[in-house]
């Protein structure tokens, strides 16, 4: 009997580990997170609390190994930082298993099903507030290949996606555990089915709904170059920028209205900035298209990671400085201003790369009327899908279109529903470009108006459920 229980325990742990390994990380399979916690949750009530925690901890830790190469060898985090990150995430999952187990052992499958997503969203929200990387690693990004699911973000923000996924997982685990009376399990099936089906129906409806919009033709362009060129003398930077300006003239199709170039195409001093501005003002006038250029502006006392906007008539109309810099990697000074450009098709906003990991900034832009976000970026190749989709989800949350050009990444054009309209990967040593049309429309979402109300609801509900659990103990 003991050997049978041990085999069941190991099988449950390995099943959850495998599902989380392939369902999270840089290239997730969207349906796997819906099932990943189920085996562990289903068996948890039959185990002692210590065993249930260790099972959840081990399963999630093994699943997180899908990020090891990225963390250790691509972004080269210190080993102790990686271990701390992986262990904390596994502890959070293990505690979530214990939280659900406490309700299952008291015969409350409905509360157990609610407890898991409520706990998870509360933890994700606290992490997003406290972490310098905000929503990086959020469960919601695993769902970017399932467009109906992510539409709920226009109401709840990113938090509603995580909730729906783990509500299904929690309910399935509770049902398989056998906890509760038959009528309770029947009510649970009906309630969760209604909620999950409603979210899919809403998503399908939103994808099919349309509003009067204006099409904008956008060209995205980038060239991957060695780090030695970026860190090299200013002459090399100016040469590369000149090549970009020539490529803009050559490759932008007639009728292009906006051209987005990547983040940090070069580092230039104040004395050379006028030359760069003249170069791209001329290119903008020649193509009759607005140009967004990402550069590092170096002053005697500081440097700024900037995005500069040149209008179709060749004028420098805006300079945006990146708000959210990567700790320990970007030494530049953070900006704090929004830049919005009123154009014939609507109001365009500027952000840079990591800025779009932070929901609040995009929500502020949307509240100010932005309907197209122009985003220079710089990724690490292996994370190109994930980081582009994080930005796409900001567009879904807030009802704006997105044009994102990432060196060492993807050139991505998406609409305000998250549909990818044009996309291609960059390549080393040569220019790559893609052109597409995107409909832009002023469409303020419920999430834009109300903010993180759903996350706060989950935090409040978690406090109530935790107090109830402590009182019952």
Question: Which residues fall in each region the model found?
Answer:
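Short, solvent-exposed cationic patches
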Residues: 335-349, 370, 375, 437-458
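CN hydrolase (nitrilase-like) catalytic-core segments centered on the catalytic cysteine
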Residues: 75, 117-118, 258, 265-266, ...
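Soluble catalytic regions of membrane-associated enzymes that act on cell-envelope
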Residues: 203-331, 341-344, 350, 354
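Generic structural signal for well-ordered alpha-helices
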Residues: 96, 100, 245-249, 338, ...
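Conserved beta-strand and immediately adjacent loop positions that scaffold enzyme active sites
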Residues: 217, 306, 337, 410, ...
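Membrane-embedded alpha-helical bundles of multi-pass enzymes
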Residues: 2-207, 381, 394, 411-417, ...
């Amino acid at each position: 009997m003991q050997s049978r229980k041990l085999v069941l325990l190991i099988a449950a742990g390995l099943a959850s580990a495998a599902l989380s390994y392939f369902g999270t990380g840089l290239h997730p399979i969207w349906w796997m997170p819906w099932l990943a916690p189920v085996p562990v949750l289903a068996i948890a009530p039959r185990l002692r609390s210590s065993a249930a925690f260790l099972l959840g901890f081990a399963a999630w830790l093994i699943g997180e190994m899908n990020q090891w190469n990225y963390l250790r060898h691509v972004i080269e985090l210190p080993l102790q930082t990686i271990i701390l990150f992986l262990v904390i995430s596994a502890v959070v999952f293990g505690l979530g298993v214990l939280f659900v187990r406490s309700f299952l052992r008291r015969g409350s499958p409905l509360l157990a099903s609610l407890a898991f997503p409520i706990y998870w969203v509360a933890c994700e929200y606290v992490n997003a507030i406290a972490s310098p990387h905000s929503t990086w690693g959020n469960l919601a990004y695993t769902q970017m290949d399932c467009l109906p699911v992510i539409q709920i973000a226009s109401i709840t923000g990113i938090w509603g996606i995580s909730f729906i996924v783990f509500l299904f997982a929690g309910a399935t685990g509770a049902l398989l555990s056998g906890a509760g009376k038959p009528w309770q399990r029947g009510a649970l099936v009906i309630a969760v089915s209604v909620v999950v089906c409603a979210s899919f129906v809403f998503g399908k409806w939103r994808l099919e709904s349309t509003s009067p919009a204006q099409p904008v033709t956008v060209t995205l362009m980038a060239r991957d170059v060695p780090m030695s060129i970026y860190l090299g003398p200013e002459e090399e930077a100016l040469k590369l920028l000149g090549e970009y300006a020539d490529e803009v003239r050559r490759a932008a199709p007639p009728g292009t209205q906006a051209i987005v170039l990547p983040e940090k195409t070069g580092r230039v001093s104040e004395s050379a900035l006028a030359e760069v501005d003249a170069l791209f003002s001329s290119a903008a006038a020649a193509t009759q298209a607005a140009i967004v250029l990402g550069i590092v502006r170096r002053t005697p006392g500081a440097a700024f990671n900037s995005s500069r906007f040149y209008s179709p008539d060749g004028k420098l109309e805006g300079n945006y400085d990146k708000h959210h810099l990567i700790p320990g990697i970007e030494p530049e000074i953070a900006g704090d201003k929004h830049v919005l450009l009123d154009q014939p098709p609507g109001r365009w906003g500027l952000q840079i790369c990591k800025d779009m990991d932070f929901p609040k900034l995009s929500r502020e832009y949307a509240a100010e009327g932005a309907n197209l976000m122009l985003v220079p970026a710089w990724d690490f190749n292996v994370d190109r899908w994930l980081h582009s989709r994080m930005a796409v989800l900001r567009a879904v949350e807030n009802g704006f279109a997105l044009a994102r050009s990432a060196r060492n990444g993807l050139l991505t054009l998406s609409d305000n529903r998250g549909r990818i309209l044009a996309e291609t990967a960059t390549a080393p040593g040569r220019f790559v470009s893609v052109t597409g049309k995107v409909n832009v429309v002023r469409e303020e979402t419920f999430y834009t108006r109300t903010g993180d109300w759903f996350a706060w609801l989950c935090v409040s509900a978690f406090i109530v459920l935790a107090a109830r659990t402590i009182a019952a103990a």
